[in-house]
Amino acid sequence: MKATFGGGCFWCTEVIFQNTEGVTSVLPGYMGGHIDKPTYEQVCTGTTDHVEVVELEYDDELVNYEDLLKIFFKTHNPTTLNRQGNDVGTQYRSVVFYHNEEQQILAKNFIDELENEDVYEDPIVTAVEPAATFWLAEDYHHNYFNDHPENPFCSVVIAPKLQKFLKEFKA
């Protein structure tokens, strides 16, 4: 099964799903824009309309789509438009890209439940859009956290997020 999420910097999202049981592949890339084969530099200009995403392959006998949605919403801020923390731009917007009608329904229902339960103080701005062409990110973005733990962004932003995830979902 396939799932695609945009939740800010793909370095953050990638390592979370790499540590999720049942997820067999996590690839960083770009989706949702209007040019073919975008580069990181082009996407960062904010003019291509692409989102930094991770495309997952998962075994639905080990993890279901609702579990992936729960992880996605717990590990980023779905209430900030075009921003995650200090990362600002349309490439960081919160998006669930669905691959079939069931995923679309599950994502919309999940967001409705969060809104009805007042889980967040502010309204959820996460978009639910049909999956488009997935453009694989440049090689140096792959496995970024694990390959660059000394990078300040990794140690200050990603490591605490990963620890929080591991504490909550691996306990």
Language model segments and positions:
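Flexible coil/turn and secondary-structure edge motifs
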Residues: M1-A171
